[in-house]
A protein has these predicted regions:
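Acidic, low-complexity/disordered tracts enriched in E/D and polar residues
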Residues: 1-78, 84-87
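Short acidic, hydrophobic short linear motifs in intrinsically disordered regions
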Residues: 76-108
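Intrinsic-disorder-associated interaction segments
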Residues: 4, 87-94, 110, 114-121
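Short, polar/flexible loop-turn hinges at active-site or ligand-entry regions and domain interfaces
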Residues: 55, 109-110
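Conserved alpha-helical substructure of the radical SAM core
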Residues: 108-109, 116-127, 131-214
């Protein structure tokens, strides 16, 4: 199914990269969200929502746009003041941010009633929080395996990097004491360590490749 001009413009401006927020709702645990674009534009290919680094949830384009606008509102909330990183999101703030997301989403879907978007956003967030806590969501949400989503992936959802060389000059070099080490004894275990500038370049390349977790 083809996407509209408004959807295409929004996708190019706001959905071509990985979007991320971490929520700390009342109750146990946090909700860490990575929204990853599919390989190609189109309504038939779902976005991937990576929930707490483990659960994979497909998201259609309209809900991806709604969630992206809510993420943007939250990001602005936490960067608009000197003490922004320590601010608590009170109920009145949450409702205001949700309303900002609804207004922004209506610029893409002007014929959709605000009430419908408010209900959709509330249902989406309630469902994601429930899934993150291992509870039943208010509506049935289809989860995916990596094998199911592989044809649509624009990049791997995780990249593990070896920070330190395991050995140098034939002697053990790593200062970590991990219970299980899968880097020991590997052919690249004695590779030359990167400089700070090289690490920054590597991380920037991973960001541009849409790999959400490192």
């Amino acid at each position: 199914m083809r996407i509209t001009r408004r959807e295409k413009k929004f996708w190019e401006q706001h959905l071509s990269c990985v979007r991320h927020i971490t929520l700390d709702p009342k109750g146990p645990g946090v909700v860490r969200l990575h929204m990853i674009p599919p390989r190609a534009e189109g309504k038939d290919e779902p976005f991937l929502l990576l929930l707490n680094g483990a659960k994979l949830i497909p998201l259609n384009l309209s809900w991806a746009i709604l969630l992206a606008n809510f993420m943007a509102a939250l990001e602005h909330f936490f960067t608009e003041g000197d003490n922004a990183p320590d601010r608590e999101v009170k109920q009145a703030d949450w409702e205001r941010l949700a309303e900002e997301a609804v207004t922004a989403t209506r610029s893409v879907y002007p014929r959709t009633k605000p009430e419908q978007l408010r209900e959709d956003l509330a249902l989406l967030m309630e469902s994601l929080i429930a899934i993150a806590r291992g509870q039943e969501p208010p509506v049935e949400v289809g989860t995916l395996s990596l094998g199911d989503y592989a044809p649509y992936m624009s990049a791997p959802h995780r990249m593990d990097l070896m920070v330190s060389a395991m050995t140098q000059d034939g002697a053990w070099h790593c200062n970590q004491k991990c219970l299980h080490c899968y880097a020991a004894g590997q052919p690249m275990g004695e590779s030359r360590e990167l400089t700070t500038a090289q690490w920054k370049e590597a991380l920037e390349r991973l960001r541009h490749a849409n790999i959400p977790q490192v």
